[in-house]
Amino acid sequence: MLQPSNRKYRKDFKGRNRGVASRGNRVSFGEFGLKATECARITARQLEAARRTIARHIKRGGKITIRIFPDKPITKKPLEVRQGKGKGSVEYWVALVQPGRMIFEIEGVDEALAREAFSRAAAKLPLKCLFVKRTVM
């Protein structure tokens, strides 16, 4: 699973996930992409499950690029522990995703296969996604 190797501080503030993606919103590395259409927190486990689904569907065909990274720690206190006594320990890692953000990209496969692979991967993610093609400018 993806997580940062080292950080200056172990725990983050809760924060808010608002706005639209101004960066990482175009297909850059592949021919087809899976684009987010709403805000969400995607966990490292969800990302890995979606990646495995894509890899299993396209077999040895193409190259998968993951465009997001789970770099935000989410903390949790143990069950049946009273409030107070400091912040809980890091439970898992998430990537904050805004609408328009590219999540995965594929190259080296035909469109029908890529569309089906992304459709299966989108079912593993907690947000609505859109299949997009690279536009040449």
From Swiss-Prot:
GO molecular function annotation: rRNA binding; structural constituent of ribosome; tRNA binding
InterPro entries linked: Ribosomal_uL16, Ribosomal_uL16_bact-type, Ribosomal_uL16_dom, Ribosomal_uL16_sf
UniProt keyword annotation of Aminoacyl-tRNA synthetase present: no
Mention one GO biological process in which this protein takes part, according to its record. Answer: translation
The entry's keywords: Ribonucleoprotein, Ribosomal protein, RNA-binding, rRNA-binding, tRNA-binding
**Per the record, where are the segments of Basic residues compositional bias?**
7-17
Q: Name one GO cellular component term.
A: cytosolic large ribosomal subunit
Keyword flag Translocase: no
Which cysteine pairs make disulfide bonds?
Answer: none
Assembly description: Part of the 50S ribosomal subunit.
Instruction: Cite the HAMAP family for this sequence.
Output: Ribosomal_uL16
Q: What does this protein do?
A: Binds 23S rRNA and is also seen to make contacts with the A and possibly P site tRNAs.
Among NCBIfam families, the record links this protein to:
rplP_bact (TIGR01164)
User: What family is reported?
Assistant: Belongs to the universal ribosomal protein uL16 family.
- UniProt-recorded name of the protein: Large ribosomal subunit protein uL16
Q: Which organism is it from?
A: Coxiella burnetii (strain RSA 493 / Nine Mile phase I)
- Source organism phylogeny: Bacteria, Pseudomonadati, Pseudomonadota, Gammaproteobacteria, Legionellales
Q: Which gene encodes it?
A: rplP
